[in-house]
Amino acid sequence: MKTGIHPNYAEITATCTCGNIIKVNSTAGKNLHLDVCGACHPFYTGTQKVVDTGGRIDKFNKRFGMLGKK
């Protein structure tokens, strides 16, 4: 490997809005601010919401359902 061509590899901190602090190695060289992390993401915490699209389907069938029936 050639010397002097590789970027500096330093430890930085990634801070989440929930207060979780993660130390990682990076070539970016500056600290990161995250919106979500593994500690507060809805998928990992089990608090994810199910999107109910039933209202949209009912609205469609109400408007166009009679066209499919003979």
Curated annotation (Swiss-Prot):
User: Which keywords does this Swiss-Prot/TrEMBL entry list?
Assistant: Metal-binding, Ribonucleoprotein, Ribosomal protein, RNA-binding, rRNA-binding, Zinc
Cofactor annotation: Zn(2+)
Role this protein plays: Binds the 23S rRNA.
> What do we know about how this protein assembles, alone or with others?
Part of the 50S ribosomal subunit.
Q: InterPro entries, from UniProt?
A: Ribosomal_bL28/bL31-like_sf, Ribosomal_bL31, Ribosomal_bL31_A, Ribosomal_bL31_sf
Per the UniProt entry, the signal peptide is none
Which HAMAP family does the entry link to? Ribosomal_bL31_1 (MF_00501)
Give the species this sequence originates from. Answer: Shewanella frigidimarina (strain NCIMB 400)
Positions bound to Zn(2+): C16, C18, C37, C40
**PANTHER family reported in the protein's UniProt record:** 50S RIBOSOMAL PROTEIN L31, CHLOROPLASTIC, LARGE RIBOSOMAL SUBUNIT PROTEIN BL31A
The family classification in the record reads: Belongs to the bacterial ribosomal protein bL31 family. Type A subfamily.
Return the protein name. Large ribosomal subunit protein bL31
Q: GO CC annotation: what is one?
A: ribonucleoprotein complex
Gene Ontology biological-process entries: translation
SUPFAM superfamilies named among the record's database cross-references: L28p-like (SSF143800)
